[in-house]
Amino acid sequence: MFCFISSLCLSQQTEEFKLIKNYYNQHRSMLSKEFRKKFDAETNNYYKASIKQDYQLFMQKMDSIENVALTGALLKTKNLEDLDKLKLLNKNLPLEPSHTPSVVIDKAADYPGGINELRKEVADLFYLGGIYSDIKTIKANVGFIVETDGRISNVKAEGDNYTFNRQAEIAVYSVSQKFSPAIVNGNPVRYRFRLPLTMNIE
């Protein structure tokens, strides 16, 4: 599930994903207040039901628009990571550090609250409206690097469903907290982390 990799300076900021989430959550909050005012002011139950239906439809559209923005952030992030890899190639440095099985890891990289908290947060961040599948149970293995400062980079989901893979990558890049980095000989090191995901789509 895990393997150690030596330290290199490729770091990915997930700040853009957080900014997008915060932006759309702020707009959801403002819209909810406005719809609530309109709903509370209406006395006719038929119109109240219509306002509620409009609100639900509007929020579904907001989710879809947010997903488009997150997909754009994912493409930008992957392009920037590819450019970083090209810079390493130009400097004749290896893209992937050599795996050293004999190195003893003092402490593995860990997410605050542990693996179950990470799985829960990733599941909560999934946008199911962006997944297209005839199969109800979808699986993917998500690999990424935990950098020495706890940020994540090079997220890559591998599975049979492209849309599920893309949503998995967006969800992992969007997690709210940094990891505690792996430690070798008292020093933080880059660490390859694997997260198997299974989701039932209804």
Task: Give short role names for the model-derived ranges.
Residues 1-3:
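Sec-dependent signal peptide recognition
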Residues 12-202:
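Charge-biased low-complexity segments
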Residues 6-8:
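N-terminal signal peptide c-region/cleavage motif recognized by signal peptidases
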